[in-house]
UniProtKB/Swiss-Prot annotation:
Organism placement in taxonomy: Bacteria, Bacillati, Actinomycetota, Actinomycetes, Pseudonocardiales
Family: Belongs to the pseudouridine-5'-phosphate glycosidase family.
Protein name: Pseudouridine-5'-phosphate glycosidase
Biological process terms in GO annotation: nucleobase catabolic process
Cofactor(s) needed by this chain: Mn(2+)
């Protein structure tokens, strides 16, 4: 076992040491979020997108028990093909390390490892949050509590729309995690540009985000800054279709007695099948849109 974890690739370490822009990318989208072989193509495209923008990509995952910041192309291929790869949140990291497991890191684990490596910007698709019925089940993503103590910039299209978004926004406020809309005053709903919930703050440029980060750091606040970046309306899932399919998914989950951790993959799979894979294409568009904004923010912060 390496004496110091995570292992940071030479390319990422040199970029950080030189003050060049770096953007972290998670790997559960590779291991669990997208079907094969599309998962590998999207992972490669995201890294290429960052490089074309003059930014060093740092895809983060765990390979054979080694948390790694800046996976090689071969390591990404291995994770993309590994049907035994596990989903690794922050609490799972010591277990994965001790047992030599391989897996994709969630938003929580990726944020933790990125910050430990010194990376300041992280782009993902959608944030985890508070699940429906959490008042009795206490089912809430570790993403939220991790971001409360991890001072980086997270770019996402809001939180996944299967969640209780009103409760998620309340928890973000309670945890002192600032949320700013990017060119919007409405919280995005992942598949749709507008979840129906207002945001108090918005920014119009990457430079404004950089200024917010500078102010946060000067105040020595330890929370992440969540930049809520909506998918362009012309590329979103039709809002009425989204509403109907989501309601049907919940009804089917209740009929089959599916709840807790099993509900997320069930609901997402139902939405994908019910929309004829249209939701899959929107998912990828959301991710690419956030990667592009993450690159712009990283450049602004490095400049």
């Amino acid at each position: 076992m390496p004496l110091s974890l995570p292992v940071i690739s030479t390319e990422v370490r040199q970029a950080l040491d030189a003050g060049r822009p770096v953007v972290a990318l998670e790997s559960t989208i590779i291991t669990h979020g997208l079907p094969r072989p599309r998962n590998l193509a999207v992972a490669r495209d995201a890294e290429r997108q960052l490089r074309d923008a003059g930014v060093v990509p740092a895809t983060i995952g765990v390979v054979a028990g080694t948390p790694t910041v800046g996976l090689t192309g071969e390591q990404i291929e291995e994770l993309a093909a590994d049907e035994a790869a596990v989903k690794i949140s922050t609490r799972d990291l010591p277990v994965a390390v001790a047992r030599g497991a391989s897996g994709g890191t969630t938003v929580a684990a990726t944020a933790f490892l990125a910050r430990k490596a010194g990376i300041r910007v992280f782009a993902t698709g959608g944030l985890g949050g508070v699940h429906h019925g959490a008042a009795t089940t206490f089912d809430e993503s570790a993403d939220l509590v991790t971001l409360a103590s991890t001072p980086l910039v997270l770019v996402s299209a809001g939180a996944k729309s299967i969640l209780d978004l009103a409760a998620t926004l309340e928890r973000l406020e309670t945890l002192n995690i600032p949320v700013v809309g990017y060119r919007t005053r409405r919280f995005p709903g992942f598949y749709v540009a507008d979840s129906g919930h207002d945001l108090e703050h918005s920014v119009d440029t990457p430079q404004e985000v950089a200024a917010l980060v500078e102010a946060r750091d000067a105040l020595e606040l330890r929370s992440a800054l969540l930049v809520a970046n909506p998918i362009p309306p012309e590329r979103q899932l039709d809002p009425e279709l989204h509403r109907r399919v989501l309601a049907e998914a919940w009804e089917e989950a209740e009929r089959q007695g599916i709840s807790g951790h099993d509900s997320t993959p069930f609901l997402l799979d139902h939405i994908r099948r019910a929309t004829g894979d249209r939701s899959l294409e929107v998912n990828i568009d959301v991710y690419q849109n956030n990667v592009a904004l993450g690159a712009s923010i990283a450049r602004a912060m490095a400049g």
